[in-house]
Amino acid sequence: MSWLDKLLPPKIQQTDPSTRKGIPEGLWVKCPSCESTLYRTDVEANLHVCPKCDHHMRISARARLDALLDAEGRYEIGQEIVPVDALKFKDSKKYPDRIKAAMEDTGETDAMVVMGGAIHTIPVVASCFEFEFMGGSMGSVVGERFVRGAQAALEQKVPFICFTATGGARMQESLLSLLQMAKTTAMLNQLSASKLPFISVLTDPTMGGVSASFAFLGDVVIAEPKALIGFAGPRVIEQTVREKLPEGFQRSEFLLQKGAIDMIVDRRKMRAELAQLLALLQKQPADAVA
């Protein structure tokens, strides 16, 4: 026993560290914008938007779709399609190893989830990128799921919505991933010919081959606040042109000012805003639109 232990009253003497109850991990989240420490449950209840500074954190595909679609009548499209290593690609790791790790980390089989359902009773098909799955990169599976979602919308004569959160085309699939740019765009031409709305919602980040293909082809193009949207990243552009880019370059507000997008919508208001848009585009009422 040390001299300090002798001075301390018995009730406040230190306990054995091995018997202390530790604080469970993952209870707190640090906002990357204002650096506030937030209770995870509060953040999730606020759709992963910081309650102090309104910074829109990244959110999983399923959490986003859960917040968007009516609880009843949901169904998933294309979940049976899984990636294959057709090119036997290997960089620092084998492609199948990267796929396996991404599946374990996210619980998803690829970087897109597609669901049919309704928004305030208006039938829709909605697709959403999962950024945590290999950076939301677009490969053959993502392209095929997107097309099947659009085909389902075409068959049912309902609007199609896509939430993008991606670094672009998947390099491990090389030309096969680049083919998805043409494939997805061609499918949207069929929707357009049938006078069915396609709404594109750009979230942080939307880059590369996705931004260069279908991301800006929406009848209405929406973005979340301060989302990074472009083809190449700001650092790459600065290194190429050897100039400092303007403040806020490639952010939602910059694109809105330049006319590249139609509107910026807070995530917490997205469901209501989409319902109103769909009601106008479809010329039908939406029940209980906030």
Swiss-Prot record:
InterPro entries: AcCoA_carboxyl_beta, Acetyl_CoA_COase_Trfase_b_su, ClpP/crotonase-like_dom_sf, COA_CT_N, Znf-ACC. One of its GO terms (biological process) is malonyl-CoA biosynthetic process. It holds the Pfam family Zn_ribbon_ACC. Its cofactor is Zn(2+). Zn(2+) binds at residues 31, 34, 50, 53. Its EC number is 2.1.3.15. Binds 1 zinc ion per subunit. Gene3D superfamilies: 2-enoyl-CoA Hydratase, Chain A, domain 1. One of its GO terms (cellular component) is acetate CoA-transferase complex. It catalyses: N(6)-carboxybiotinyl-L-lysyl-[protein] + acetyl-CoA = N(6)-biotinyl-L-lysyl-[protein] + malonyl-CoA. Residues 27-290 form the CoA carboxyltransferase N-terminal domain. Keywords: ATP-binding, Cytoplasm, Fatty acid biosynthesis, Fatty acid metabolism, Lipid biosynthesis, Lipid metabolism, Metal-binding, Nucleotide-binding, Transferase, Zinc, Zinc-finger. Acetyl-CoA carboxylase is a heterohexamer composed of biotin carboxyl carrier protein (AccB), biotin carboxylase (AccC) and two subunits each of ACCase subunit alpha (AccA) and ACCase subunit beta (AccD). HAMAP family: AcetylCoA_CT_beta (MF_01395). Component of the acetyl coenzyme A carboxylase (ACC) complex. Biotin carboxylase (BC) catalyzes the carboxylation of biotin on its carrier protein (BCCP) and then the CO(2) group is transferred by the transcarboxylase to acetyl-CoA to form malonyl-CoA. Belongs to the AccD/PCCB family. This is Acetyl-coenzyme A carboxylase carboxyl transferase subunit beta. It comes from Cupriavidus taiwanensis (strain DSM 17343 / BCRC 17206 / CCUG 44338 / CIP 107171 / LMG 19424 / R1) (Ralstonia taiwanensis (strain LMG 19424)). The lineage of its organism: Bacteria, Pseudomonadati, Pseudomonadota, Betaproteobacteria, Burkholderiales. The gene is accD.
